[in-house]
Regions:
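Conserved short alpha-helical segments that host acidic/polar catalytic motifs at enzyme active sites
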Residues: 1-221, 229-264
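Glycine-rich phosphate-binding loops that contact phosphosugars or nucleotide phosphates
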Residues: 261-337
Length: 337
């Protein structure tokens, strides 16, 4: 339906655009709750991945101050706060470089950076935020906390996504954005800003990923494709990890043998198929190592008080390395000691 509605409007005269498919964590799956969410005056459009845990408190304060809301989302709370913060800052709130921008674009970008930094200080939870302004529609300003954000660097075009799969068919050059950093993106330049307000050098890397892996290759669904790819995937995984004596060599595991031998319990955490992989590993570890293994969904592990001792090994499994529930579960495990 979305494609039909967009196509019905004819060609869009725009250089930059944002969009996001959001799980209905706040509010029902309705058009009013869909992204992007707009500021009350229509100046700003914002998309958000993650969960703002203090959204209800912030919304109540805004309503008490005269604001009205059109949706049930935590995202709309953020864009309301951003519009207010934008009016409270000046271009002098950030004096560093801004993605090669000049004139009105530069002024708007500087104010958006200041506003974004002010808003993120009020938010509790995990988020990636992208915002555009109708005063400078060629610029996107983004921020992240405990939620992934990757920039794709193209030729005369740049991309923002939670994973390289969002843009790998267009470019294999990428920049990962750090915790609590703000980024200004135009079609030609990218500026990354640290939490203290200082610009930082881009940490560019090359994506070793073929866009063919993002297609169904003739299968009706990705699920069927991945099921039939499993034998080859297991073979490819083991191929470089078996030495000349036929023994498994896991050089990536940088844990001293003495520490591994002291482990008396293993907890494996993951989401979806990563959790299933943990179930398979449980059989192997308990059979050959005679060490008890627990397997738990990351989303459940992070909300309970697990028994994690000094000799407990917690293994996190994630296909992307960016599964938010799993990352939060790792932090929770570390807090247990």
């Amino acid at each position: 339906n979305l494609i039909e509605e967009v196509d019905a409007d004819g060609p869009i005269d725009a250089i930059a655009g944002i969009g996001h498919t959001r799980w209905a964590t706040h509010g029902r799956p309705t058009v009013a709750n869909a992204h992007p969410q707009m500021s009350p005056d229509g100046r700003f459009a914002l998309v958000h991945n993650g969960i703002i845990e203090n959204a209800d408190i912030l919304r109540a304060a805004l309503i008490a101050d005269g604001e009205a809301f059109a949706s049930e989302t935590d995202t709309e709370v953020v864009v309301h706060l951003l519009a207010r913060a934008y009016d409270d800052v000046t271009p002098a709130s950030y004096l560093g470089p801004v993605a090669g921008l000049t004139g009105a674009d530069e002024e708007v970008a500087r104010r958006l950076v200041g506003a974004m930094r002010a808003v993120t200080e009020q938010l509790h939870g995990t988020f990636t935020l992208l915002v555009v302004s109708n005063q400078s529609p060629n610029v996107i300003v983004a921020a992240r906390r405990s939620s992934p954000l990757v920039i794709g660097l193209g030729e005369g075009e740049n991309f923002l996504g939670s994973d390289v799969l969002a843009f790998v068919e267009h470019t294999n050059r990428a920049v990962e954005i750090g915790q609590d950093q703000v980024v200004v993106v135009s079609a030609t330049d990218v500026t990354v800003i640290d939490p203290d307000g200082s610009p930082v050098a881009l940490k560019e890397y090359e994506v070793d990923f073929s866009s063919d892996r993002a297609t169904k290759n003739g299968w009706p669904t990705f699920m069927e494709k991945e099921i039939h790819e499993q034998p080859d995937a297991v073979g490819a995984t083991l191929a470089d990890r078996i030495d000349s004596h036929g023994r498994l060599a896991l050089d990536e595991v940088r844990i001293p043998e003495s520490v591994l031998r002291s482990v008396d319990k293993v907890i494996m955490i993951g989401c979806g198929t990563a959790s299933y992989a943990g179930q398979v590993a449980r059989y192997a570890i308990e059979h050959w190592c005679r060490i008890p293994v627990e397997v738990e969904l990351s989303s459940e592990f992070r909300y309970r008080d697990p028994v994690v001792g000094e000799k407990t090994l917690v293994v996190a499994i994630s296909q992307s390395g960016e599964t938010m529930d799993t990352i939060q579960a790792i932090r929770h495990a570390r807090e247990q000691g």
